């Protein structure tokens, strides 16, 4: 395997921090932003110290765990809620396995693992979010929302974010309109300009 080569494989499992594991011959490749069971195309972008990482290029086949359509208009470009197409119970099960593995790897004694307790509400539950101003794309219009998955600078408008109450969507829309109307620029990290 060499950097830049493209492969296809099935994500066998997802470890904490959304790190998918794809087996290619005798090599396990870490591919972020997938769901167990998805057949994906990825490009090798890091190879060092016996570890290989790939960048997801395309989902070729859905996973059996993907049993519903996404509710969000900017899914899957946004990295805010990766598992929207999975049933909530399946998300909890997968996350519980990830947490249990973290504990198993960290402690060398027996312990009692309490299962995850799911929220009674699946969407519009967040009372805190960190939205950013930025360009929708390079030199594009001002946007206010969440960073595009895998991007430090591109920001997707979160006009109908399903993680927050609809009142927050209205506030975001008003704030964005206010700054666009006045031509106020966001703070550009590289140029040290804007507000």
List the predicted regions and their residue ranges.
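Accessory RNA-recognition modules of RNA-modification enzymes
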Residues: 1-195
């Amino acid at each position: 395997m060499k950097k830049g080569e493209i492969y296809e494989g099935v994500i066998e499992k997802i470890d904490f921090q959304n790190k998918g594991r794809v087996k290619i011959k005798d090599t396990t490749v870490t591919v972020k932003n997938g769901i167990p069971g998805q057949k994906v195309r990825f490009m090798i972008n890091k190879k060092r110290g016996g570890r290989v990482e790939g960048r997801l290029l395309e989902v070729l086949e859905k996973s059996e765990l993907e049993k519903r359509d996404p509710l969000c208009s900017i899914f899957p470009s946004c990295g805010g809620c990766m598992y929207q197409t999975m049933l909530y119970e399946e998300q909890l099960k997968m996350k519980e396995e990830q947490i249990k593995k973290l504990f198993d790897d960290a402690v060398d004694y027996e312990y009692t693992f309490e299962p995850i307790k799911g929220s009674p509400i699946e969407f519009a539950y967040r009372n805190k979010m960190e939205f950013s101003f930025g360009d929708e794309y390079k030199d594009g219009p001002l946007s206010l929302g969440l960073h595009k998955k895998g991007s430090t600078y591109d920001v997707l408008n979160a006009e109908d974010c399903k993680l927050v109450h609809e009142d927050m969507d209205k506030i975001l829309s008003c704030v964005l309109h206010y700054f666009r109307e006045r031509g106020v620029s966001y703070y550009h990290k590289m140029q040290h300009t804007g507000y």
